[in-house]
Design a protein with these regions (language model features):
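Residue-level recognition of the GNAT/N-acetyltransferase active site
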Residues: 120, 125, 158
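Conserved N-terminal entry element of GNAT/NAT acetyltransferase domains
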Residues: 7-37, 199-200
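A short helix-loop-beta-strand connector motif used in the catalytic cores of GNAT acetyltransferases and
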Residues: 68-81, 97-101, 118
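Conserved beta-hairpin
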Residues: 78-92
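Conserved acyl-donor/pantetheine-binding loop and adjacent beta-alpha core of acyl/acetyltransferases
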Residues: 93-121, 129, 184-185
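Conserved GNAT-fold acetyl-CoA-binding loop/helix
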Residues: 47-69
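C-terminal "cap" of GNAT-fold acetyltransferases
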Residues: 151, 158-162, 169-171, 180-200
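Conserved acetyl-CoA-binding loop-helix of GNAT-fold acetyltransferases
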Residues: 124, 130-143, 166-170
Length: 200
């Protein structure tokens, strides 16, 4: 029994050590229009890897996300690749203000639209999931927002995306409520809205 406990402790410590190593080597890189093909290929690679991603995320090729979505973020300097050393392992959009649908949520932090950063389309390739990469990406997003003097980081997760909800809550994001939204890819669907307060 003691040997089993010692082994479990060792494996847990080793996993934590490996996750910290990933966090140390992970960074965000802003992209340009010339990177659009690479961005698209990343998201399609995720969706093609398993039907579960389309079901959980409710993403549909060329409906959402599509080139117009990515371009709108890229031209405003809000689209990023997630890099581990030199390897591209994911992507994310971090906007410099919130959109109108966020105005109906009862947020904990009092802030104008331009005083918050909003996370969209966060994705990590399947082979890097489960090893701390998503948490490390959130670390970098929080740093990015803090450097821009934002008061909070906000995001939403579709109700079917339970893994993301667990990730955000474990990280420290506060559940600020739900709202029904209509999108072409999802229809009328409930979303959960989260907020992470930044120290002033």
């Amino acid at each position: 029994m003691e040997r089993t406990r010692a082994l479990e402790c060792f494996l847990s410590e080793r996993q934590e050590s490996e996750e910290k190593a990933i966090m140390k080597n992970l960074r965000l890189k802003e992209v340009s229009i010339k990177d659009l093909d690479q961005i698209r290929a990343l998201y399609w690679r995720l969706l093609d890897s398993s039907p579960k991603y389309g079901q959980i995320l409710q993403w549909k090729k060329n409906i959402y996300p599509n080139d117009d979505d990515w371009n709108s973020y890229i031209v405003k300097g809000e689209m990023y690749l997630i890099l581990k050393d030199v390897d591209v392992i994911g992507a994310v959009a971090v906007t410099n203000a919130q959109s109108k649908e966020y105005g109906k949520i009862q947020w904990k932090v009092k802030a104008d639209d331009q005083d918050v950063a909003v996370v969209h389309l966060l994705m990590v390739l399947p082979e890097y999931q489960g090893d701390g990469a998503a948490t490390a990406a959130l670390d970098e997003i929080i740093k990015l927002a803090a450097d821009k003097k934002k008061k909070a980081v906000r995001l939403d997760a579709i109700e079917t995306n339970v893994p993301a909800q667990k990730l955000y809550e474990k990280y420290g994001f506060v559940n600020c409520g739900t709202a029904q939204e209509y999108y072409e890819s999802t229809g009328e669907t409930e979303f959960v809205f989260y907020e992470y307060a930044l120290a002033e």
